[in-house]
Amino acid sequence: MIFQSFLLGNLVSLCMKIINSVVVVGLYYGFLTTFSIGPSYLFLLRAQVMEEGEEGTEKKVSGTTGFIMGQLMMFISIYYTPLHLALGRPHTITVLALPYLLFHFFWNNHKHFFDYGSTSRNSMRNLSIQCVFLNNLIFQLFNYFILPSSMLARLVNIYMFRCNNKMLFVTSSFVGWLIGHILFMKWVGLVLVWIQQNNSIRSNKYLVSELRNSMARIFSILFFITCVYYLGRMPSPIFTNKLKQMLETNEIEEETNLEIEKTSETKETKQEEEGFTEEDPSPSLFSEEKEDPDKIDETEKIRVNGKDKTKDEFHLKEACYKNSPTSYSGNQDISKLEILKKEKKILFWFQKPLIFLLFDYKRWNRPMRYIKNNRFENAVRNEMSQYFFYTCQNDGKQRISFTYPPSLSIFWEMIQRKISLATTEKFLYDDELYNYWIYTNEQKKNSLSNEFANRITVLDKGLFYIDVLDKKTRLCKSKNEYLQKDHDPLLNGSYRGIIKKTLLPFINNDETTVKKLIDEIFINKIHSVLGNCNNYQEFEYKKDPFKKNPISSKIRHFVTLMSQFDGESTFNQKGISLLSEHKQICSEDPEIFFKFLVDTIIADSFTQTIPKESIGIKEISKKVPHWSYQLIDESEQEEMENEKQVSWPHQIRSRSGKEVVFFTDKQENTDNPTPNTADISEQADEVVLTRYPQESDFRRDIIKGSMRSQRRKIVIWELFQANIHSPLFLDRTNKSSFFSITFSRLIKRIFKNYMGKNPELDISNYKEEELKKKEKAKEHKKDKEKKQEQIRLDIAETWDTIPGAQIIRSLILLTQSILRKYILLPLLITGKNIGRILLFQLPEWSDDFKEWTSEMHIKCTYNGVQLSEKEFPKNWLTDGMQIKILSPFCLKPWHKSMIRPYHQDKKKKEQNQIDAFCFLTVVGLETDIPFGPPRKRPSFFQPIFKQLDKKIEKLIKGNFQVRKRLKEKILFFLKLQNETNNWIIEIFPFFKKIIRKMSTVNTIGVFGLKEASSEIKSEKDSRIKNHMIHESSVQIRFLNQTNSSVTEKKMKDLANRTRIIKNKIEKISNDKLKMSPKKTRYGTKNLGQILKRRNARLIRNSNYILKFFRERIYGDIFLYIINIPKINTQLFLESTKNGIDKSIYNNESITKTNKNRIQFISTINKKFLPFLSTSKNNSKIISDFSFLSQAYVFYKLSQAKILNLYKLRLVLQYRGISLFLKNEIKDFFGTQGITNSELKTKKLPNSGMNQWKNWLKLKNNYQYNLSQLKWSRLVPQKWRNRVTEHCEVENTNLYQNEELINSKKHLLLLPDQKYNFQKNYRYDVLSYKFFNYKNKNDSYRYSYGLPFQVNKNQEFSYTYNYNINNNKFIDMWWNIPISNFSYLEKTKIMDIDKNIDRKYLDFKILDFSLRNKIDIEDWIDISTSINENTKTEPRNYQIVEKINKKSLVYSTIYQEIKQSDQKNKLFDWMGMNEKILSRPISNLEFWFFSEFFSFYNAYKMKPWVIPINLLFSNSNVSEKFSKNKSINRKKKTNPFIPSNEKKSFELENRNQDEKELVSKEDLGSYVQENYEKDIEEDYISFIDIKKPIKQKQPKSVIEAEFDLFLKRYLLFQLKWADSLNEKLMDNIQVYCLVLRLINPIEILISSIERKELSMDIMLDRKDFNCPNWKQKRVLIIEPIRLSIRGDGQFLLYQTIGISLVHKSKHQNNQKRYSENVDKKFLGERNKNNFDLLAPENLLSPRRRRELRILLCLNSRNNNGVNTNPMENRVKNCNQFFDEKKDLDRDKNTLRNLKFFLWPNYRLEDLACMNRFWFDTNNGSRFSILRIHMYPQF
């Protein structure tokens, strides 16, 4: 065994090391690069094939050497930087490559040009050998850069980033390439030897010599074709579209704008020196820059004062008041601009270097689409890489980072150049750097830990805890002044304001754009001044201009004006009253109006007092790379030309299309009777459509001059293929291929034929088949039409795609038109009339030429749009044309008379309308539509032949008598034949009867067998005949319905015959029975007859046998294959369930306990017993039962008999079980003899010291405690049934108010239900004792009776207190179930989880009216499960939950349970024994998300004051306040008071609440009597949340009702649409008032008359629902996003459990709150409190994360490069809970610290750690699943 393990281990490790070594990987990648065969191989193969003799061998050697040297240089250039830069620069390679190519072609085509006549054999002097060496060397270098090669050659570069020993990798990859190259050359040599030895090739010596002589020319041609093919893919480096005009204009504009800025800056300084500044209001009013788009975040090199500066120096412009005295209408520096333009035109060509003329690095050199951005006129360079590789320090070591900032790396390189060599040598080595990094991390960790511990100690002293909290980091201007909140980048949330800044569009300084400037810009400026003063009052730069001088009265006049025309650019009001002195300004001249408006605002607001300091906004912007060009497409160019703006040639290719003019409207000029042609062209209105070809346009939206896309894997098999695509999408095309028929379709087709209908029903399906045939014919016709249409379109596209084809076609059409009109048709007319003359008939010259003249040829566009007769379409020669023939001429043999009957005349007119026009084809034929098939014309000779037939018939009619006699003779013979047939039919039965009588007795045959029974044979014959007659009768019945008279007659004859035959056969059979009714005779059967019958029977039944066999195959095999996954999954689920059950019981106990089966623990089905092993190991398994409560398991085991449970000893003595068991349970099992004394003596751990660990042990008990509705959304039914098989408890200690219920109906419990109820009580007590086993207070003793036998002095029940802390909004960590997450949708439906498969009705679905049945909580009882029993109760119960509404943050719940007589307590099933109460709206709690009720108005008032998690806390407003409650409201509650004071205040409130509830006897009567006071008090409660200082400030009735309206219908978060303005809000308020009134009709009518209520906006009660509002865009409903999905319950639960810890700084309330509740319900408990504060919240989130990482990640274990930081973190986190290592250390500080740190980890923090801290991001969110959130024990 040792030897085998030694061998196997060594072999595996050795193989893994060899495979993963750098040498093997390098050899593999190098071998792969051999297959990247490029043009450089042509020279190598040329030398191998062509050269012979001694010189040929030298050339072969030199070619191979050059090839290898070139490849070696390429491999070295990967590692050696200077060589890589030299070979990688496109300028150098291209400049060297192009002359060398020319030289090479010149050398090959003129061989004797460099022939010096030297006969020396020295290879160094032979220039041709050297050229072979150079060719192979240089073209190996070109292969990577000038000629694109395959991806295989670049694999070496890819692996370089992963390899540490790069030089070894490069060497090994070169060796691998060399091996592959040698093998390739050997293979080429073998092929050449085979060619030389081939007899067929050697016999043709002449061809071989010719081929050898022309080999050089063939290789040069191949090389030239390859180079052209490769170079055709990339744009030419010299002849490119440089966009010179835009380049010049952009540069000139940049420089001129900078000059203007420079002059304005000098003016500013001068003016500041003089002591005053004058502001320029036009740009400064609106915080916008000039119209120059090039100012925005560009990185272009520009000239300022003779120095090169980048645009980065200018991208943080002050968008503020520029202190230059320029006006809004123009620029004072226009003269300077013109001078600069002239200078730049002269100096432009001299400043350009040669490289920029040849190569423009800013041009589009890849296939790129131009994406416009409205904010930036120039396009963003989106092909810039998001990754930048550079070395950086990570985990104390130098590593490559792919997200390193490029600017930082460049800056670091610049610094390194400046630093001397002496300083660079002082840098730390790798190991020293790593140790130093560890040391600094330890220092950071210690300092943070000490600070953290100090904060905790300060907090324990009871000081004011706000000073303990870590403050947020903020920027400050000085020591005493913070930076403004909206400008502070370290803040987030609502402090950061959003400034809507609309940049001005690109505007040219032309006269035509002045109107647009006035219309668009100035109104936006005015609106921004007036609008921003109201909206952004916190922004200082908006408030400062109006601090010293208020807004003048003139501006106030325009507030209403601007609000009406928000966003519009023009005013259309006829008369607008502006001021008293300006009464009306007509809107006919709006320019005067706007100028007046702007001048008024400027003069009034800003020229009276001028601030000394200009206010600037430092814009926080991100630098985005842009192209230096502004490109436009054809449509934009046309728009600019139409608007007479300065346009430039378009550079973006549009889709190739043709403009089709289908309507031209020419308006005649009435003023000018002889208009010019120019006037006509201006007035002509053309309606144009663009026609695009159906082929794929690969050039659309591509910039001119950019490289075309290198499309691969596209197969073109047709000469003209419209839509080319990859074979990958072959299945999506319409063409049916062989591969599209899948195997499944083939199977279906086979079995469909054999499993079809019976052949007996074929006759009855005759009509259906006829209908199917007709449908198929219709489909075939449609398909034919589609094919013809496709052919027509293909022909049209073919003419379009072939270059020059339209010119040829147009000329051919014109010649065909002339030939038809003037040559062909006149010749036909003359030939016809000459023929008539020769046949002695009158000619029809006039008629024919009349029809000929009516034919007109009209030129049409390519699409067939008709023009005038003499007018040609535009660009007809290039775009194509059609010729339409109106009234086409058709040659007729004669013309009929004009007088015809009416119906013939009508048909003729219809035919003429059809043939009214046609189109001429290229061949000269006629077609109905362009490029359609040629139509058939009536034949010229067809009417002539018809006339000849008529003549012949007349001749035949002359011999009518002869024909009559012949006919009589024929009829006589036919009649005679019919009579003989009838006679034979009558005689046939008589002969048949005689034959049957003779055949009854047969002679003995050869084999001597017995007689045959004639009866059996006759029965068989009659059966067969009856079968045939039945078929014919069915056929007769069906065919009698046909309309044909001939078939009808035949069918009647057949029916008569069959009837006669049938009657005679029946008569014969009856006679036979009379002759021998009882006697059975046996006839003889020979062997041949028997075999013949069996053969026939087998043949007859073989079809049915085969059919049955196929059906069985299909039904058994294929359906079984389909159901295999289902069977496997079912077996797996059942086996897991049985395995779990078997681990609890064993086989014997199962068989004995089957009679008393309980629904929570499933027994093993006997069917699956063979699949389960019965070994002892399985009996010891006790796995994580996520669906079983362990306490319940032990409880059920305690109820079982001793004999059945004696084998549970192994289970109960399992290691770790003692931690779960209480002493009472151990004693009980000990009395049963199941456990031993060891189990009882084990010491329990201190749960107060290690609560998190205890919760982890118990975490599986209730992690899937979901309600029925939530389970139905998460998992399938069967799995749900298994998981939810744990007990849940009913809240039966609910003390209801009988006076308020006022119900006489009682639902009596059945005995079974009572038993189950008692069982739940027992488990309730057991589970409470189980969880709270650390509590040593044994003053309570539990029993199993229905009413708990407890002290009467105690006013509490343990039924409600086993999970008391569940309802706090900050929960204990060991007690967080998944039901806490369901606070959002707290179901008011009874949880009927005890019977899981039971169907029940959800009462929330029912439609209740708005006024009646409102208080749903009053008549639906709440029954909660084991983790939900202290949730919100309805208002008519005495469990009253109090909340102090004065504080926005602090939330407490006080519960009081009154002990009452248990005899009157009845089980309330679904709350149906209560009366449905009619309550007003004011007593309503909104029933969907009632947790939002308490903080609704406060959150609406100031949303960011309250942490959002408080809305999800379990706090509900109870409306049953007593009169004494107002006393508590008067006291101001401060959430930030110290803990001692606050505790006393809470105790005082608690005592008052107890007195209220004890003294109150009838809560329902109190609510009914004090109805109006309750309404008022309800309103005041909301006001108190908003205004906690003031006691009572009641709202108006409208506001209060409006709040209630929103409270009622706020089922989702409502996001108001923009259309919901003040008018709609007024309507809502009136509507809310009306809802409460008893008789609202009068107020409705009056409000409608006063126009306060609009019935168009508001909806009536029937249509009052959210979908209608959503359709009318009144509301946008955004439901709360819950992270619940049907899969991944584990991740769902863990995420919820982690995220439930509250993030608020006020979590210290949790401790005081838990103490109050515990003292109230349980009396004085131990000092080991379970609810402790999470002290890490004292730190800020950033420092908290830093502390976590420094503590959790042991930096000394993080050694390797490939180690996973997640795994290291998990490994170290396990040490927190290791009792041997960790818990024995400093118990007072370290253990408590780590205890609180790890549970408060959040999932998002872990994700951030993965992405940012470790600088890695694998793009997979599933990497988080590798985290072991809870360590194993």
From Swiss-Prot:
Keyword set, alphabetical order: Chloroplast, Membrane, Plastid, Plastid inner membrane, Protein transport, Transmembrane, Transmembrane helix, Transport
GO biological process: protein transport
UniProt biased composition (Basic and acidic residues): 259-273, 292-301
InterPro entries linked: TIC214 (IPR008896)
Region (Disordered): 254-301
Transmembrane segments: 18-38, 67-87, 90-110, 127-147, 175-195, 218-238
Main location: plastid
One GO CC term, this protein: chloroplast inner membrane
Stretch forming the signal peptide: none
Entry superkingdom: Eukaryota
Membrane topology: Multi-pass membrane protein
One Pfam family from the record: Ycf1
Subcellular localization, as worded in the UniProt entry: Plastid, Chloroplast inner membrane
Keyword Plastid applies: yes
Family, similarity comment: Belongs to the TIC214 family.
Purpose of the protein: Involved in protein precursor import into chloroplasts. May be part of an intermediate translocation complex acting as a protein-conducting channel at the inner envelope.
Additional detail: There is a partial copy of the N-terminus (positions 1-481) of ycf1 in the inverted repeat (CAB88779).
PANTHER family to which the protein is assigned, alphabetical: PROTEIN TIC 214 (PTHR33163:SF40), PROTEIN TIC 214-RELATED (PTHR33163)
Subunit relationships: Part of the Tic complex.
Name this polypeptide is given: Protein TIC 214
Organism field: Spinacia oleracea (Spinach)
